[in-house]
Regions:
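Short, small/acidic-rich helices and loops at N termini and domain boundaries
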Residues: 1-92, 369, 393-395, 400-402, ...
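Glycine-biased, small-residue-rich flexible motifs in mid-sequence functional cores and linkers
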Residues: 1-5, 87-410
Length: 410
């Protein structure tokens, strides 16, 4: 893509009053994005309103700055990590998006060169859920994603706190397992900001790892902040790109339920992991199961329902964006990731005091002492002291054999 063509695409997405429907009609009539900006006012008025015509004739005030910023973002390329601005009609543009009523005019992509083939990979599963999960929810998201990635399934999520982060981590772990397909993308993250930003900041190292072994994707221009309105739009791309969606844990309401609803409307399979009837974090999954989502207890349940997810074709012989074509990328972040696959994580868990931390780690399950210790990361004396306080205050019940459960769950 030339500089002029990139500039025309960026100008189109910045033009006030030109939404997806108008933009697609303009492209259909004029055939090329540069041609519509070279058209006469009279020709434009045959396609769009006079006010929209006036907008198209005036360069948006932020356009020059965005073009320079995007060119700089693209020009700092290395062979290890590529960047690309992929527009509607480009061979790399995900064909799955064409089924949307409002496919993005362009996407930004950043990641490992071989991973760009994943943009046309039909063997994908979205794993989504709460930003404030229980410990069991985090464990399930990680374990399901790890197992599926080991089998070659491409895990898709949104880089959010909680379940999303655990799903990406599990996929990264699974892609390193013995027997996992070689040369495949580990995971794809669809984000709700420009790709020159990371949200949440706590996932900066995770984003680094995804950029090294998978792809980060955004339809938003560089510099776009994490606006609340961006994330429901992002969810439509997750559902469109995936063959099915697994909701690990979700309350009511939840953005992950939006993704599940979109998937149902698109005829995709929706899976949900059940939880305790006492847990608010499980109510969204239970609602989905009532509406026809498939209850799953293990990752193999998903593979049994979607056998076509296996095997994933290797991505070793794939052409990635070439240097000098506005499509190669350097590492997006300067520091080197030091996150270890084996480290415990508590993404989204923020208890307010020690006893509440133990209750959060206990969740709504029957949990043994070793698991509690691993989740809390405490020395045994401190954990046992907290358990004693909770038992004396009638908040938990010892079940014998080193197992504990919250009280009031009868």
């Amino acid at each position: 893509m030339s500089r002029d063509e990139l500039g025309a695409w960026l100008r189109l997405i910045l033009t006030p009053g030109i939404g997806p429907v108008s933009a697609y009609e303009l492209l259909r009539v004029f055939g090329h994005v540069k041609a519509l900006f070279e058209a006469s006012p009279a020709a434009l008025r045959l396609v769009v309103s006079p006010r929209q015509t006036e907008s198209l004739l005036q360069a948006p005030p932020l356009w020059d700055g965005l073009l320079s910023r995007t060119l700089a973002w693209l020009d700092a390329a290395t062979p290890q990590q590529h960047r690309a601005v992929i527009t509607l009609g480009d061979p790399l543009y995900p064909s799955a998006f064409l089924n949307l009523d409002d496919p993005p005019l362009l996407i930004h992509a950043l990641g490992a060169p071989a991973a760009f083939a994943a943009l046309q990979n039909p063997k994908t599963l979205a794993v989504v859920g709460s930003r404030n999960p229980t410990p069991a929810g985090l464990d399930n998201a990680f374990a399901f994603s790890q197992h599926l990635a080991e089998k070659g399934v491409l895990i898709v999520s949104g880089l959010a706190r909680g379940i999303d982060g655990a799903a990406h981590r599990g996929a990264l772990q699974g892609s390193h397992s013995q027997g996992a397909p070689v040369g495949t993308a580990a995971t794809l993250a669809f984000v709700g900001t420009g790709l020159d930003q990371v949200y949440p900041q706590a996932h900066r190292e995770l984003a680094q790892r995804i950029a090294q072994q998978g792809l980060l994707i955004s339809e938003y221009p560089l510099g776009t902040p994490p606006l609340a309105s961006n994330f429901p739009k992002r969810n439509r791309l997750i559902s469109a790109f995936s063959q099915g969606v697994l909701v690990v844990e979700a309350g009511l309401p939840s953005g992950s339920l939006v993704t599940a609803r979109l998937s149902m409307e698109q005829g995709k399979e929706v899976f949900a992991i059940p939880g305790s009837i006492h847990s608010p974090a499980s109510r969204g999954c239970h609602a989905l199961i009532k509406q026809g989502a498939k209850l799953v207890e293990k990752a193999q349940d998903i593979l049994d329902e979607l056998p076509h997810l296996l095997p994933v074709l290797p991505l070793l012989q794939v052409a990635s964006p070439a240097s000098g074509s506005l499509s190669e990328a350097p590492p997006p972040f300067s520091e080197t990731s030091t996150e270890k696959f084996s480290e415990p994580f508590t993404d989204g868990l923020k208890p307010t005091d020690p006893d509440q931390a133990v209750l959060a780690a206990l969740g709504y399950e029957v949990v043994d002492l070793d698991t509690l210790q691993a989740r809390c990361g405490w020395a045994t004396p401190a954990l046992q002291a907290a358990l004693m306080r909770l038992e004396l205050s009638d908040q938990i019940a010892p079940l014998g054999g080193g197992f504990f459960q919250r009280r009031g769950l009868a």
